[in-house]
Amino acid sequence: RRLFSFATADDMMRLCEGVKDQQSWQVAIRRFVETFVGYVTVTSKPGVYAAQIFRWEVTCPSTISRELQLAYGNKVYEVLRTLLTMALGDDADAVKIWGGAIWSRIAALIVIDKSWVSHFVPRGVGRDEWLRRVSDNICESVFGSLHYRG
């Protein structure tokens, strides 16, 4: 549990608080995306251990998968669902589709083996800059299609 408390900061659960308009909604979405892009690509301990467990559970769920889902995953998914509902209303299918699209793009970063990095990272671009660009790209796809409705 302590290991995953690093990967599920308490303030993630408070992202929806204070969202009242398009600008604050975009800030919350961006923070969600940037936070999880950072979590799944972390290179220092103890975060790297949490990222490795997350990678394993995403690709080959084990017996602890359900416990992780109940303890952490459901809360984090609820934050994203709440943020998406602010733009999509009560359309549960659209919320699931958008949630899946966002998560799949973040989760793809977990499984990129170092030997494949050259296929995804532009030559001469540092890790932090690349991660910022990836986060920007994910957010721009959301902001180009969805708008805060309350």
Named regions from a protein language model:
Residues 27-45, 74-97, 101-150:
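C-terminal peripheral helix-coil segments that are non-catalytic and often amphipathic
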Residues 1-28:
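Amphipathic alpha-helical linker/stalk segments
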Residues 44-67, 113-119:
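Amphipathic alpha-helical segments used for helix-helix packing
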Residues 9, 22, 26, 41, ...:
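Interdomain hinge/linker segments and adjacent boundary elements that couple functional modules
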Residues 19-23, 67, 129:
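Short, solvent-exposed segments of well-ordered alpha helices
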Residues 14-19, 62, 123-127:
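A short, mixed-charge helix-start or loop-turn motif at secondary-structure junctions
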Residues 1, 5-10, 38, 51-56:
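Long, acidic, intrinsically disordered low-complexity segments
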Residues 68-72:
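Short, solvent-exposed amphipathic helices
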